Amino acid sequence: MSDRFASIGFDDFRTEVALLVNAGLAQGSPLSPILFTFFNSDLVDQPVTFRGGASAFIDDYFRWRVGRSAEENLAKIQSEDIPRIEAWARRTGSCFAAEKTELIHLTRRKSEQLQGQVVINGKTVKPSPTAKLLGVIFDHELRWKEHVQQAIKRATKVAIALAGLRHLRPEQMRQIYQACVTPVVDYSSTVWHDPLRDKVHLRHLNTVQRGPLIRILSAFKTVATTTLEVEAHVLPTHLRLRRRAQHTIARLHTLPRKHPIWSALLRAQRRRNNIGNYARFPLAEALKTMDLQTLDELETIDPSPLAPWQAEPFAEIEVASDRETAVERAETARSMSDIVVYSDASAREGHLGAAVVALDDNLQVVESQQVQVGPMDRWSVHVAELIGIFYAISTVFKIAHQRTSENSREKTATILCDSRSALQATQNPGNKSGQRIVHAILQAATEVQAERIALRLQWVPGHCNNPGNDAADRLARDAAYPGKSHSFRPLLSRENAHLHVNILSQWEQEWRSSSKGNHLRKIDGTLPATYTRKLYGSLPRNRAYLLTQLRTGHNWLSTYAKSFGFRDDDHCVCGAQETVTHVLVDCPSLRGIRMELRREVGDAFRSVSSLLGGSNEGKKGKPDTVSRAKTVKAVLDFAEASQRFWSRAPRGQPNNGNGN
């Protein structure tokens, strides 16, 4: 913050560089929250107990007291807390704005909710029915009704602005909706949303999602929300909030045991199985949807970074830009290094294995090691590659000790790995899944470095007829069988993937048991599935409008018009009942343009489901999207030429007068 210089530039003009007398921070500087932590430390330095506590975020400070009555809490705040706060403000030159100070009693005793007052800086602050803290609106009884109403209001405002956009494809609209609207609703949902109980809140929140989905698909307003969600492949609101809560809980369980959040987690685990009228809170209720044993087995991810002054454990980590260069450099490293070790990982029948191989000059295996990593639902190929590197370092250490001689010169060792992502994760360690393995690699490399061994990591392309890499690949494949022969704990990333799969399975069950969307279920029996995004994704709005009518059954045909009382009969111009199947396959009035449709779609004409991009067979989510899109395009051309899917209401006479 001292000895800082700056100049002012405008176009070609620039002032001389001058010393900044009062050097502050630029707005948005990442140093701001760090410096505020030091600045606020004396104010916030209070123990958090069952009697109360204090916390702060930048310039938002909040103090809470827990007592038998509102009167008792107010007395302690006025006599103990406010004098200390005012003394800190005088000492630091700060000023608390009394007009921005809020007081709220969190109690369900109606008589105490607006009781008493406090005086700060000579101004009286009375209790209010709500208080806003970091964007979350608290109410007396923590029922969060006001916060949900505010979230709905803000999200609806953004959704209305979204409706004003023009010339966007469905996939673009969907992306904007998920980037701009859902974060407004989801903000701090883990605080106010109970995944098992908030039916009233969800009923109101569902209305926020319905409007944008109608806009995305250009659908009729009578289409059910569940059908719109399946067609746009957008998670229902309650499942999206549940997934968010589960991911947050899983992430919290990876924090070190010394972290303060663990006291709340352990309390929530004890309260998880409460029976009766005991107080509930969202964390404990959300834990009911998860497996505690699986959570306790997860890896630990330390949010604090590594010390920046630590020496680099590797002499070099080289990731070449192209395969040819990497092959040449790998051959050079093999000829120049005293010790060369290859590591690789492989998957087979749902299990992962890793292996390490060292070859002699005759390309014979002199040292090898195999590791059973575990099942793929708890481990990933990326982490298996990291485990291979970890055991490769131990192999280097072992070979170096076997070759100990009187020559005490520094040795060079190279580990060749065919995973770029594993090398990059080792080069740039962070607080991500697999952190413990990366830290173990760095620690092992530091120990090897202490033995005067210059250790290098280098990328070698896989399947390039490299004897060492091929040998490691074979051994890794042989090690990929049930079991686990290492000490690392299961990954957060795989647990998140498992939770996501469970959410999708629940969505599928709800869709299959729903009373809505019968027409769509007959057409497409594999929903919900991601390929519907590709069906609609690149269509212009007028084409998406046609496809939605065909697939949902809510359209301009007579059958639909009669069901809503817009027509007295459901007859086609040919006299038969006018349905989607009748128009596409049977109506004699459209025989001419139907011949062109049959030529373009071929065998798909045998099934209305195939014509409309649906399927009742095959592997879910992996259809032949190219041929399916071609078929749908031909059907949309036919539907447009038939002129059956546009409003056939009589046009009114134009108003040529000057009046209303």
Residue map of PLM features:
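Catalytic palm subdomain of template-directed nucleic-acid polymerases
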Residues: G24-L25, Y61-R90, R108, L196, ...
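Short, conserved micro-motifs composed of acidic
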Residues: F13-T15, E80-P83, A87, R91-P129
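Hydrophobic packing residues in well-ordered alpha-helices of helical domains and bundles
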Residues: A54, L74-Q78, I82, F96, ...
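Active-site palm subdomain of RNA-directed nucleic acid polymerases
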Residues: P33-R68, A400-N407
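Conserved pre-catalytic core of RNA-dependent polymerases
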Residues: M1-S29, R65
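RNase H-like, metal-dependent ribonuclease domains
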Residues: S2-D3, L106-G122, L142, G164-Q178, ...
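Inter-domain linker/hinge segments that demarcate the starts of reverse transcriptase
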Residues: N73-G93, T156, E328-E331, I387-S394, ...
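Conserved pre-motif C helix in the palm subdomain of viral-like polymerases
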Residues: V21-F50, R143, E171-R174, Q178
